[in-house]
């Protein structure tokens, strides 16, 4: 039996409903077992999208990119140098990337501010929805996504769902080392993050199902 058949059989036995078991098995496989993203050759990339992963909180309350986002910025700048593609990235990645690229080729994405002037958390989905609200996704052409390795599959999948022609850059190793001092607790170690990522995948799928 295949992995999918085994999952369907288990869920069918648990739920007593073979039809629902098949549908649920497909969801479980996609949202909890799939940790790869479709890839594309680097020379085909026309736009680079960079997603932040955590940050560092200073003693005075200020936020800085931190080591993970600095590593992502290096990758974004390298890809931009190889392809000539512009970089559109959350500010934690855009700020250090701009220091590595000349000519204003990096466009930062900033979060909104609340009534106290504090930044409002901007989710992966929120980033992409904001970009799509301003600019048609198809206008970006082939999009190469730069993101933390465990975050990358969801970034690509979410972008594709919103109409971006998005891929992981082929042959480019994304950062894998978690920052134990991250200002976002779910970005400090792997197991909590993987659970967090699965939760978000399932939450977004639930929302889509309820929206009909």
Residue ranges and their predicted role:
Residues 2-5, 9-10, 14, 18-189:
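A structural signal for short, hydrophobic/glycine-enriched beta-strand patches
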Residues 176-212:
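C-terminal capping/extension of enzyme domains
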């Amino acid at each position: 039996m295949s992995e999918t058949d085994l999952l369907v059989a288990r869920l069918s036995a648990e739920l007593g409903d073979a039809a629902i078991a098949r549908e649920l098995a497909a969801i479980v496989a996609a949202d909890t077992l799939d940790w790869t993203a479709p890839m594309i050759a680097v020379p085909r990339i026309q736009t680079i999208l960079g997603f932040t992963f955590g940050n560092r909180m200073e003693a005075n309350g200020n936020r800085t990119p931190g080591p993970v986002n600095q590593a992502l910025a290096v990758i974004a700048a390298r890809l931009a140098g190889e392809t000539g593609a512009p970089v559109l990235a959350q500010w934690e990645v855009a700020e250090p990337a701009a220091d590595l690229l000349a000519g204003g080729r990096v466009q930062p994405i900033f979060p909104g501010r609340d009534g106290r002037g504090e930044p409002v958390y901007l989710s992966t989905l929120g980033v992409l929805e904001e970009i799509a609200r301003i600019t048609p996704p198809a206008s970006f052409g082939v999009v190469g996504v730069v993101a933390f390795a465990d975050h990358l599959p969801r970034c690509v999948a979410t972008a594709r769902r919103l109409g971006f022609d998005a891929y992981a850059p082929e042959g480019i190793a994304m950062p894998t080392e978690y920052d134990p001092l991250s200002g976002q607790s779910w970005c400090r170690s792997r197991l909590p993050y993987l659970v967090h990522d699965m939760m978000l995948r399932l939450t977004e799928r639930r929302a889509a199902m309820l929206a009909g």
